[in-house]
């Protein structure tokens, strides 16, 4: 079954915000969905993509109810080529076989299907007097930063200094494996960033280049970030590296592999 709605279920009645109807029967609907062999919730509203697994609600086929929060084709309300969290303006493609979703992908509106991530230098400085690209407000992955006339805070994480940071916008925390390779040999597994952070490069673009001035542009609700310490501690000096992300579709076992071998160091494509 595909259950389509507008506002996400993922926080249910516990979510804040004026858009949430706390009298709606979120839990009751989730329970009803478990009576089917497979269940997917298709929603939008957020202007960023996010996958959410309802682990407490398992279907007759043995897989949890899976919620697909779709990013917007118009992105951040046509202000650039991105959704508010840095994912490209996008839509999703689904391959259905019989009574099951065999495969799916989130596709950027101006990108090839294989474009599924950006990889950053966790030590890079954006904006400020010492940052590249330049700008009024200074941001780093490890310290965060503040910007706009409202002094909006963007959170950082100290673990990210000296690390490769991958933003993978169609990921989830159960069905993806992200690995780091050098010279064709695996160095290690990348880990989820242990605290909520935004895409710092994207935040700098929004505040320094587009003049944004609200917390919408520092969103940390959807976490798509993985990291690993760079060999030698400086990502810019590492040669012949690759971040490889492997997605296993939970309902079919289908496997998708995506790769990135270049650092995103500026706002190109934004």
What annotation goes with each model-predicted range?
Residues 1-66:
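His/acidic metal-ligating clusters that form di-metal
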């Amino acid at each position: 079954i595909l259950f389509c709605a507008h506002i996400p279920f993922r926080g249910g009645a516990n979510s804040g915000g004026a858009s949430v109807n706390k009298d709606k029967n979120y839990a009751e609907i989730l329970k009803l969905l478990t009576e089917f062999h497979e269940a997917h919730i298709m929603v939008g509203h957020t202007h960023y993509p996010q996958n959410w697994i309802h682990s407490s609600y398992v279907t007759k086929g043995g897989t949890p109810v899976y919620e697909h929060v779709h990013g917007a084709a118009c992105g951040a309300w046509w202000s650039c080529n991105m959704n508010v969290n840095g994912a490209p303006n996008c839509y999703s493609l689904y391959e259905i076989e019989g009574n099951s979703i065999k495969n799916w992908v989130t596709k950027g509106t101006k990108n090839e299907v294989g474009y599924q991530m950006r990889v950053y230098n966790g030590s890079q400085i954006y904006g400020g007097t010492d940052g590249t690209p330049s700008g009024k407000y200074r941001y780093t992955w490890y310290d965060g930063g503040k910007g706009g006339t409202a002094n909006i805070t963007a959170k950082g994480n100290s673990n990210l200094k000296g690390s490769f940071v991958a933003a993978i916008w169609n990921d989830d925390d159960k069905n993806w494996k992200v690995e780091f390779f050098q010279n064709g040999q695996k160095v290690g597994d990348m880990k989820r960033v242990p605290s909520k952070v935004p895409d710092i490069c994207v935040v700098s673009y929004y505040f320094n280049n587009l003049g944004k001035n609200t917390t919408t542009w520092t969103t940390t609700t959807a976490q798509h970030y993985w990291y690993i310490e760079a060999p030698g501690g400086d990502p810019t000096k590492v040669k012949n590296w690759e971040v490889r992300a492997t997605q296993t579709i939970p309902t079919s076992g289908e496997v998708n592999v995506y790769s990135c071998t270049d650092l995103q160091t500026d706002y190109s494509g934004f």
